[in-house]
Amino acid sequence: MQVAVIHTAFEDSPRTVASVDVDDNMKVNEALEYAYRWTNNVMGSWSRKEKTFDDGTENGDYNDAVTVMAPLNEGGMGLRSTSMGDQMLLGTTKYKVAMCGFEAI
């Protein structure tokens, strides 16, 4: 099962930034939470597909289950974190990232 992550909160038009592979046995909320976590810059960069940075620092946000679908920013800077107002598509249902959790739209 896959979750498409669509950044819309701060963009002029929606942009699909990632596809996240999730376990088929996950409940909807679990799958959305997993995709949300792994498209956030918490301990590195989720979108820079490097296990270790040039300075030797481990990229704690690297995850093989995440496929980056959008080009990186200028200078190789990674993409922003998924935020409230962004969207996720799971199956045929689209969800909006809410202040707390997700809302089907």
Predicted regions and their residues:
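Short, compact, well-ordered microdomains
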Residues: 77-105
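Feature targets compositionally biased, intrinsically disordered low-complexity regions
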Residues: 43, 55, 59, 74-77, ...
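Short alpha-helix capping/helix-loop boundary micro-motifs
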Residues: 65-81
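N-terminal non-globular leader segments, chiefly Sec-dependent signal peptides
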Residues: 1-62
